[in-house]
Design a protein with these regions (language model features):
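Short, low-complexity N-terminal intrinsically disordered segments enriched in polar/charged residues
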Residues: 1-27, 31
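A solvent-exposed, acidic/Ser-Thr-rich amphipathic alpha-helical stretch
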Residues: 3, 24, 30-76
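A generic alpha-helix structural signal
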Residues: 10, 58-61, 113
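Hydrophobic pocket/interface hotspot
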Residues: 13, 25, 33, 53, ...
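A beta-strand edge to alpha-helix "cap/lid" segment located at domain peripheries
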Residues: 65-118
């Protein structure tokens, strides 16, 4: 992955979220994706904070968009590796987030670990 590819991924991902376009958001993810986030526990009541599979991810993201109708992200930094990125962004409330995303051979997100400030 190059710097430009990583930024392109980040910009497209943020644009999909800011449009609240669930289909465009999910297009970034593998069917067998795993996402871990403390917000999963908060919104879905899953104690380990883990969502497995694209359909479960769809339900989680839908719940998030319903809970936060004013949701907007601003991407401010992208780190990249050979098959991973870290997207650093803030939301409409100023909460800063860093999401580590491991990419599959096809370039889709296979694993996510979300980390939040404050």
């Amino acid at each position: 992955m190059t710097k430009d590819e990583a930024w392109d991924l980040g910009n497209h991902w943020v644009a999909a979220w800011n449009a609240h376009d669930l289909g465009a958001i999910l297009a970034h993810y593998e069917d067998a994706v795993e996402l871990t986030s403390p917000v999963v526990a908060q919104l879905l009541g899953i104690s380990d904070g883990k969502v497995v599979g694209k359909e479960n991810l769809r339900a989680y993201f839908r719940r998030g968009l319903e809970a936060y109708p004013e949701l907007q992200f601003r991407l401010y930094e992208v780190f990249w590796g050979s098959r991973s990125v870290v997207l650093c962004y803030s939301n409409q409330r100023g909460t800063r987030t860093a999401e580590f995303m491991e990419l599959s051979a096809s370039g889709k997100v296979a694993k996510v670990v979300a980390n939040y400030s404050g």
